[in-house]
A protein has these predicted regions:
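A generic "binding-loop/recognition-motif" signal
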Residues: 55, 99, 150
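Conserved acidic residues
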Residues: 35, 57, 91
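Short, well-ordered alpha-helical scaffold segments within catalytic/effector domains
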Residues: 1-2, 103
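A Rossmann-like FAD-binding core segment of flavoenzymes
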Residues: 2-48, 60, 64, 70-83, ...
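Basic, gly/Ser/Thr/Pro-rich low-complexity segments located predominantly at protein N termini
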Residues: 47, 58, 102-104
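Rossmann-like NAD(P)H-binding beta-loop-alpha module
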Residues: 75-114
Length: 172
């Protein structure tokens, strides 16, 4: 963590520690001092998916996958990445979801040279919460989107081998 913080500081990032917005400084003061403000609280807990097979090997929470990839790109030793557990290389990857985290996952899997990358999303393209630009970029990179689809079960003997999906039929 300290090494990463030093890399970020060297890149021009200022860290203000033990400072609470609204108590120690107002949001208006921040806006006066800076051209842009990024508030990134982060996701602290993965959403659980409740379908059969979720406990099979090869089913990976998005944040674990992305964190391992980021750590590896920063030069860290990441045993789970090196073993293949958190590395998409030469794998058929299925990402469930349609938000920005899902888009980060599909595009990271492409960069890791996955054999194929498919994204299942329960709504249609026009109603997904993720960035449309990211979707377009992912499509151009070869990601296959299965709109109006949701996972029904993950199948395999010990390790996930396939995903049974169900089609969603919107009501007009």
């Amino acid at each position: 963590v300290l090494r990463r913080a030093e890399l970020l500081k060297a890149g021009g990032i200022d860290f203000i520690m033990n400072c609470e917005i609204g108590r120690d400084i107002s949001f208006a003061e921040l806006r006066e001092k800076h051209e842009a403000i990024l508030i990134a609280t982060g996701v602290y807990k993965a959403r659980e998916i409740k379908i059969p097979g979720v406990g099979l090997d090869g089913v990976v929470p998005a944040l674990d996958f992305l964190t391992a990839s980021n750590r590896k790109s920063l030069g860290d030793d990441v045993a789970e990445f090196d073993s293949g557990a958190l590395n998409a290389e030469n794998k058929d990857v299925v990402v469930i979801g349609g938000g920005d985290t899902a888009m980060d996952c599909v595009r990271t899997a492409v960069r890791q040279n996955a054999k194929s990358v498919t994204c299942l999303y329960r709504r249609d393209k026009a109603n997904m919460p993720g960035s449309q630009r990211e979707v377009q970029n992912a499509e151009e990179e070869g990601v296959n989107f299965q709109w109006l689809s949701a996972p029904h079960a993950l199948l395999g003997d010990g390790s996930v081998r396939s995903v049974r999906e169900r089609r969603i039929h919107p009501v007009s």
